[in-house]
Amino acid sequence: GAGQGAGVKADILTLSAASLATLSVYLIPLIALILSYDALAGEAERGTLPLALATPVKRWELFAGKFLAQTAVVSAAILIGYTIAGGTAAALMGWQMAGLVAWVRLIATSVALGAVFVALGLAVSASTARSGTAAAIAIGLWLVFVVLYDLALLGAVIADNGGAFTKSVFPWLVLANPA
């Protein structure tokens, strides 16, 4: 945001990684869900799923293949976008090893985040018969995991006022959120 990093002695990659991490939590799950929500439900609607399942390919192999392919697409987009952004920032403003480590960590965690939400989207697609239903559930999942979950935790921490929930339950609930 505006004024981010004012008075902080960190290189551009470290500051950019922090900014992009915030943005990534919103966009990567949404992109992964949009990419994967109709992978199986859409094929069932179009009539191509029975054809794919008529081959000697097992259901789990089809699911795994779609997961790997869609995760590769999300990962490639992340890698290309972040490499261009980070490379440009580093070339224009310089970098330090700590910033490079932060940048690589950002890429790795963003790819993992994308993979989790591709898997969720495929699970939704596999469990619904229509792509419209899968789309509605996928958007609902995004809303719950990315927006409402954190708001509910924040409200619970405020209501707890530093009590047992904040000290012992809250850290585990933060880790339980895939976003």
Question: Model regions: which residues?
Answer:
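A structural motif at transmembrane helix-loop-helix junctions in multipass membrane proteins
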Residues: V111-G163
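Secretory targeting signals
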Residues: Q4-S24, A64, A69-T128
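Transmembrane helix boundary and interhelical loop/hinge segments in multi-pass membrane proteins
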Residues: L33-L53, F67
